């Protein structure tokens, strides 16, 4: 965020900090950024940018440490090169800090709030900042970190109460090197009015931090359009998978409900319609981790299928068109109020259990079952790769072709492709009725498949 320039719209939260050139600048000294990127970038996908995972990391980190809810919007775009320098440094003057935050779009009062909110956590480490923190030679603090307040792992207003009471040990407020006491200069720049208000009211501190953190996360380069605020959906199906085994279509998946009231004898049903116009239902079973508490609420999960987790066995010709979920006789909706909603299900292209592995050359024959009545233009491999900056690229290669000799049943034909083993993440994609879908990951490792007939 600190690289943003409100005048020309450049910089902001765009994950440019992942570039080694930007991390090597004196303003970004230490390994904190590299460590953070190494963790959070792994959660990015082709659909979710690294910049969005950085933003979400702050949202979750603050909440799990006792802080307020921060409105989250998605849609950040990862930078393709380092941004211009401009991160404030502790040895700079108050005027330069005020100017720096103004360039980013924040007033002097907001600057005080952002620094206080950010410094409710953490501290300053000796190794990258020997001119701020002495070596402590403490076996309980081997990295010699001087904390901003006495509750460095918890969100609270102690950063303000300790500062106002004169008991603070904040190394940027009462450090031995007054040149780097930037917090002292910033906090006192309005006569301590803002910090005193934070010290007097934990509620004000919390609400103000939520507002400022949200603005910080939403500071993006010109032209980037963020989404509306994202909140957990009341109903969210996931991990939908199909396997065709002869005339049987194995159907597995789960569904997550948000903030259900506790109830031990709840009746949960999956309802679905098939291609022949019939409707069906099956009892949902609790997932292994059926209920997980989060700061915002509770996620309750169920799975489809039998006790052995094999999934539902559907007649291949009938298949499935859409599904709904019912709890205690009431259809569940994507909205907080409503009469339920159909979730469309795609069974036009599915994995076939006739897929197999050639053990002698580390190659698999992947068979995809294609519904005869579907308008399927192509079936292909999608390969995901990450470049040196962790950006994910997707290429479409290796198209499947129909196998006229592999008639499985009256509903499906088999399209086949031999695929060599790879360390890249690969999926099967298909174009159906002019729309491209990603079906799911290829089975890995290859030896998990049955051996191909010799």
Predicted regions and their residues:
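Catalytic cores of secreted/periplasmic or lumenal enzymes
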Residues: 1-454
């Amino acid at each position: 965020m600190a690289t943003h320039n409100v005048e020309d719209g450049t910089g902001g939260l765009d994950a440019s900090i992942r570039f080694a050139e930007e991390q090597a600048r004196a303003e970004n000294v230490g390994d904190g950024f590299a460590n953070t990127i190494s963790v959070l970038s792994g959660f990015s996908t082709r659909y979710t940018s690294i910049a969005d995972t950085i933003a979400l990391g702050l949202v979750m980190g603050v909440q799990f440490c006792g802080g307020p809810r921060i409105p989250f919007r998605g849609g950040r775009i990862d930078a393709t090169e380092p941004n211009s320098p401009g991160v404030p440094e502790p040895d700079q003057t108050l005027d330069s800090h005020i100017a720096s935050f103004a360039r980013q779009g924040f007033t002097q009062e907001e600057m005080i709030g952002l620094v206080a909110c950010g410094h409710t956590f953490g501290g300053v480490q000796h190794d990258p900042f020997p001119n701020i923190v002495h070596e402590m030679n403490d076996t309980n603090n081997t990295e010699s970190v001087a904390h901003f307040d006495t509750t460095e792992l918890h969100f609270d207003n102690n950063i303000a109460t300790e500062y106002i009471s004169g008991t603070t040990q904040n190394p940027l407020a009462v450090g031995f090197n007054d040149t780097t006491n930037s917090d002292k200069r910033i906090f006192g720049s309005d006569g301590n009015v803002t910090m005193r208000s934070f010290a007097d009211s934990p509620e004000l501190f919390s609400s103000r931090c939520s507002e400022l953190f949200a603005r910080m996360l939403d500071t993006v380069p010109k032209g980037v359009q963020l989404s509306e605020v994202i909140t957990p959906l009341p109903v969210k199906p996931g991990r939908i998978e199909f396997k065709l085994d002869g005339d049987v279509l194995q159907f597995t998946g789960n569904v997550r409900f948000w903030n259900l009231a506790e109830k031990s004898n709840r009746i949960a049903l999956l309802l679905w319609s098939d291609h022949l116009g019939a409707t069906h239902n099956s009892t949902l079973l609790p997932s292994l981790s059926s209920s997980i508490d989060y700061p915002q609420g509770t996620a309750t999960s169920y799975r489809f299928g039998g006790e052995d987790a094999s999934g539902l066995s559907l007649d291949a010709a009938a298949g499935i068109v859409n599904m709904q979920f019912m709890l205690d006789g009431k259809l569940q909706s994507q909205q907080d109020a409503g009469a339920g909603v159909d979730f469309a299900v795609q069974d036009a292209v599915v994995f076939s259990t006739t897929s197999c592995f050639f053990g002698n050359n580390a190659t698999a024959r992947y068979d995809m079952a294609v519904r005869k009545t579907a308008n399927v233009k192509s079936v292909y491999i999608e390969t995901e790769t990450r470049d040196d900056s962790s950006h994910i690229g997707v290429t479409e290669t290796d198209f499947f072709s129909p196998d006229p000799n592999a008639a499985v049943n009256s509903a499906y034909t088999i399209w086949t492709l031999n695929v060599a083993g790879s360390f890249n993440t690969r999926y099967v994609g298909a174009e159906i009725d002019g729309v491209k879908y990603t079906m799911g990951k290829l089975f890995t490792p290859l030896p998990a498949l049955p051996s191909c007939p010799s």
